[in-house]
Amino acid sequence: MPSISPKKLVELWVESFNRGNANEIAGFYADNAINHQVAESPVEGRAAIREMFAKEFASAGMTCLVENIFEDGEWAILEWKDPLGLRGCGFFHVQHGKIVFQRGYWDKL
């Protein structure tokens, strides 16, 4: 069975994000993944990434509205906005069906 495409994985990631499910979203990451939101320090490891999302979901209701998802080889690029107009983009490096690296940029309010 072929591995999931980076674009499809990010589509599923967005669905989990919009449900606010930190455990589910953590399952998309490799054990040693790095998530670097550029306004913050990089978060390393699936457990730490799960904790980051759990804290974020507990502190604010967040919704990711997809503008575009592009795929190039092992990479997927997500352009998004939220209901209040915040905009950003995320770069997801996917290997063997798991996110190994993610970098996010957004308009910091």
Where are the regions that the model predicts?
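Charge-dense, low-complexity intrinsically disordered segments
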Residues: 4, 40-43
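Residues that recognize and position ribonucleotide moieties
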Residues: 27, 42, 92
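Short beta-edge strand/loop motif at the mouth of beta-sheet-based domains
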Residues: 42-51
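Conserved short-loop catalytic and cofactor-binding motifs
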Residues: 13, 37-40
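A beta-strand edge to alpha-helix "cap/lid" segment located at domain peripheries
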Residues: 2, 36, 50-109
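Short, low-complexity N-terminal intrinsically disordered segments enriched in polar/charged residues
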Residues: 1-23, 27, 31
